[in-house]
Every structure is written in structure tokens, then in C-alpha cells.
């Protein structure tokens, strides 16, 4: 089915929405553009390292065998970047949270043939979702592809921070040996109160992973988790976030970035937390007030902050989180383990196959469908 741009906004929305209901198309060669991070010297070190631009999700041969064009790049910034050159006539754009190409309303307007925006991974906040909805585009992601990867990473960072591991490691690398310098702020996880702000797939799995550590588990979300699972985990629901925070030794952020959650953890909210709290955030950097986090770490009100999400990404060299004390920050990598890459690469291939056949995607994968945003982004 050939796509077209109606002269009116209403006509455009109707035309695109009708097509996107079945996730588009039918006949003809399609131009698929992918934006991924560089593999560089590491691209050939693992045949399953498919998430980089060099391997391009491992779907080039499959796409080209079906007569489609597949353009991949890591160049996404500025008016002369490769993404700008190719977005105008692209039918499908694949992006990733780990090297986010910010798809603005201006870029959407420029993309005359665009029908489908796919996120290779989870989290589509790098896309102007209201603009995509207004244009009648379909936006989808690989829901669940990084659940295990991120939950394991969160547990790791909790332990790294509580056990004061990184300063000890740096001592060894630097030829030092000072037990007191580590032990004076090292704690067990057992008996601590851990609260997750958000109890979706990742939050629930984290609570399950924490149960063997004999922690006091709490969670805040818009809705309660299944009563049987809640009982099995032994987690307590807290409807009032600000009532939960002062009780927690560890706070883990597990919510999507929306206009409601942007900057949600500001100076005032962080001040409500227990002095010496540990915070882990693998959700989105913009949920936090950047300077408020750095100041709280410097003052000692926050004993440690860890995560892999920043705003913006890549983080500039002068980003305060790079230099604040007692942090366990890395580039955005928790959801792009080799196992995670294989899951979201397979998911992208499956959804492209459905798209070419005019079939619907799994319902949970839709972020924007027929002009409507998924509930978590409303």
C-alpha cells in the first residue's frame, strides 16, 4: 500500500493511522535506516556483538534478500549528519537508547515517507512521541528485551556502592593498600530497606532478585503488582512516594521518562530521603536534577549514586556526574549485553517481518499506534 501525505493535518493523520493500525505495508522496496553505536576495534571480537553499527543487528542480508535498502550509521548530530541525509525518504527508522538519535518534530516533518519508528531496546523517550502520534506514525519497541540485563545491573550497582568496592579496586590499580579507607563506609545489603520507584517488568524482577538477600522490600507505582507475586516477594506497596523515600536505605529508579517524571527527583525530593541513602538509576538521566544529585553526593546526604543513564547522551566531558564523589556511573550499557542485543535484534527482525506482511505487532510493543500513546507515556 503506497503511503501519501494529505494536504491537511487531519487527512495526514487519518491516512497514516489507518495504515499503521496494521503496522503498515504491502508491496515495494522499503528504505530502512538504522542508527547504532560504533563497534570500532571491538566489532569483530564477538560474532554475537550485533548491536553496533558494524553488525547492524545482523539483519542486512535478510533485508537485502527481500529487496529492501538498509542504511546504517552512527552519525546522528547536526544538519549535515548521515541521519539527516537519509531520513527524508526513509520508510522505517531504527534507533536505540544506547546511542539515541533524537527524533524531533522537525525531523518527523522532514521525513516525507516515514511510516514506522522502531526502538532496538526499551525506552522511546528520544522520540517526540506527541509529534509522532500527530503525524500518524507507528512507534514500537522490543518490550522485555532488556529486563534481565537491567535488573541484574541494578543489583550489581547496589552491591558495588554498599560495599564501597570501586575505591578498593582503584587502590589496587594504583598500587595502594588502605583497608580503613574502604571499611569505614562499607555495609551489608542484608537487613537494608530497598525501595523501587516503579514496579514494571524490571522493577518486579529486581525485587525478586533481592529477596534472597533478606532485605526489607518496598515499591511505589501507579498500580499494585499481582497480590500473589507481592506476597511471594514479600514487598510492601507504598502509595505515597514521599512517605516511602525516608524509609529507604537504597532507592532504585524504575520508571519511564515522561513530562510528568522529568526532573522528578529534584533538590527538595532528594532532601526527603534518608541521610546516607544509596540511589541507583538505570531508567533515564533526565528523571533526576543533575546538579541536585551532584550536590547531594558532595555533601554526603547521598552516600552513593550509580547508573548508566545520563542527560544528554553521550555525556559531555564536563558533566558533573563524572566528577562527583562516590559514584558508580558508566556509559549507557546495562541493557545492551550480548544476550540483550540478541533479544532486541530478534525482536526488530520479527517486527519488520510483520510490518512487511501488514500484520500487527505484539500489543505490548506499541508505544504509538493510530495516533494514541501507550499508557506509560500519557
UniProtKB/Swiss-Prot annotation:
Q: Does the keyword Lipid metabolism apply?
A: no
Q: Provide the top EC class.
A: oxidoreductase
SUPFAM superfamilies according to UniProt: Formate/glycerate dehydrogenase catalytic domain-like, NAD(P)-binding Rossmann-fold domains
Query: What does the record list as GO biological process?
Result: formate catabolic process
- Which InterPro entries does the record associate with it? D-isomer_2_OHA_DH_cat_dom, D-isomer_DH_CS, D-isomer_DH_CS1, D-isomer_DH_NAD-bd, FDH_NAD-dep, NAD(P)-bd_dom_sf
Q: Which HAMAP family match?
A: Formate_dehydrogenase
- What is the designated name of this protein? Formate dehydrogenase 2, mitochondrial
Please report the organism this UniProt entry assigns to the protein.
Answer: Oryza sativa subsp. japonica (Rice)
Lineage of origin: Eukaryota, Viridiplantae, Streptophyta, Embryophyta, Tracheophyta
Amino acid at each position: 500500500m503506497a503511503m501519501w501525505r494529505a494536504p491537511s493535518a487531519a487527512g495526514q493523520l487519518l491516512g497514516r493511522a489507518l495504515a499503521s493500525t496494521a503496522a503498515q505495508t504491502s508491496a515495494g522496496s522499503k528504505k530502512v535506516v538504522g542508527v547504532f553505536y560504533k563497534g570500532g576495534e571491538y566489532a569483530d571480537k564477538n560474532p554475537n556483538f550485533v548491536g553496533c553499527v558494524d553488525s547492524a543487528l545482523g539483519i542486512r542480508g535478510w533485508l537485502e534478500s527481500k529487496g529492501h535498502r538498509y542504511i546504517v550509521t552512527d552519525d546522528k548530530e547536526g544538519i549535515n549528519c548521515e541521519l539527516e541525509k537519509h531520513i527524508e525518504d526513509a520508510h522505517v527508522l531504527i534507533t536505540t537508547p544506547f546511542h539515541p538519535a533524537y527524533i524531533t518534530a522537525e525531523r518527523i516533518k522532514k521525513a516525507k515517507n516515514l511510516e514506522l519508528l522502531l526502538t532496538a531496546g526499551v525506552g522511546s523517550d528520544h522520540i517526540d512521541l506527541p509529534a509522532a502520534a500527530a503525524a500518524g506514525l507507528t512507534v514500537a519497541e522490543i518490550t522485555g528485551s532488556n529486563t534481565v540485563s537491567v535488573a541484574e545491573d541494578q543489583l550489581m550497582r547496589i552491591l558495588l556502592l554498599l560495599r564501597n568496592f570501586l575505591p578498593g579496586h582503584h587502590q589496587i590499580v594504583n598500587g595502594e593498600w588502605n583497608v580503613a579507607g574502604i571499611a569505614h563506609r562499607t555495609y551489608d545489603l542484608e537487613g537494608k530497606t530497598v525501595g523501587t520507584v516503579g514496579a514494571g517488568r524490571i522493577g518486579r524482577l529486581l525485587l525478586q532478585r533481592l529477596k534472597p538477600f533478606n532485605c526489607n522490600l518496598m515499591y511505589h507505582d501507579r498500580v499494585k503488582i499481582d497480590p500473589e507475586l507481592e506476597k511471594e516477594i514479600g514487598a510492601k506497596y507504598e502509595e505515597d512516594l514521599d512517605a516511602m523515600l525516608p524509609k529507604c536505605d537504597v532507592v532504585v529508579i524504575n520508571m519511564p521518562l515522561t513530562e510528568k517524571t522529568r526532573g522528578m527527583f529534584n533538590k527538595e525530593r532528594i532532601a526527603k530521603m534518608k541521610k546516607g541513602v544509596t540511589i541507583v538509576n538505570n531508567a533515564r538521566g533526565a528523571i533526576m536534577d543533575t546538579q541536585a544529585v551532584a550536590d547531594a553526593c558532595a555533601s554526603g546526604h547521598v552516600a552513593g549514586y550509580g547508573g548508566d543513564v545520563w542527560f544528554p547522551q553521550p555525556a559531555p566531558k564536563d558533566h558533573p556526574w563524572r566528577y562527583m564523589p562516590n559514584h558508580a556511573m558508566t556509559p549507557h550499557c546495562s541493557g545492551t549485553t550480548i544476550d540483550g542485543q540478541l533479544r532486541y535484534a530478534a525482536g526488530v527482525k520479527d517486527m519488520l517481518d510483520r510490518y512487511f506482511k501488514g500484520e500487527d505487532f505484539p500489543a505490548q510493543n506499541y508505544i504509538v499506534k493510530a495516533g494514541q500513546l501507550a499508557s506509560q507515556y500519557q
